[in-house]
UniProtKB/Swiss-Prot annotation:
One of its GO terms (molecular function) is large ribosomal subunit rRNA binding. This is Large ribosomal subunit protein uL10. Forms part of the ribosomal stalk, playing a central role in the interaction of the ribosome with GTP-bound translation factors. The keyword Ribosomal protein applies. Disulfide bonds: none annotated. The keyword rRNA-binding applies. InterPro entries: Ribosomal_uL10, Ribosomal_uL10-like_sf, Ribosomal_uL10_bac, Ribosomal_uL10_bac_type.
Amino acid sequence: MGRTLENKQQIVGELKELLADAELALVLDFKGLSIKEMSDLRDRLRASDSVCKVTKNTLMRRAIDGDSNWASLDSLLTGTNAFVLVKGDVGAGVKAVQTFQKELKKSETKGGLFEGKLLSQDEIKAIADLPSKEQLMAQIAGAINAVATKVAVGINEVPSGMARALKQHAEGGEG
């Protein structure tokens, strides 16, 4: 039995909400993936605050209709598609998809859209290679800590150097 008009409108509304929160959308060809494999992908994406939706291309077209941020997605809406919508850590979401695809070798990314711009395969891979927010914060904290340590050592070195010079002068004066 087909979907009712009300049901379709509900799906389009849900897609619009997800797109409003998303920063990045990836379009995957999910042909050949089992339900278990799709569930595995969804579980992996949950950790990066991302969702995977399988819906008809016409419903996604209606969801992006009139939204300039997502209008370019229309060119990718052919065939059997799953849509990965990434809200939080974009790099982690893309990494989760790429790890899944490497392990299964069944699915491929057709393309993506980030800030209204279509992404090539190379650009998507570059996003996955970026460090996560946690890694960046750790690097920044390490850099700040290193500067503070150098300042502390430098401040401590002035009196120590003065004390050594005075001691050397005093010892030199006795002889």
